[in-house]
């Protein structure tokens, strides 16, 4: 059962590759290039997708449940 505190980013479901669990804390695992693809499918250019992702998602810390990004 996934903890309700696991953070799923809206619009990036296609980039989820799994879950991580450590001492009862669940973290969603995303594949970075699939995040770019999801953003480009929403109309962004590759450059804009990379910049937006890195600024708004990749470099953010939102607590113990901060998602993991696999390169």
Residue ranges: model-predicted function:
Residues 1-71:
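C-terminal alpha-helical interaction appendages
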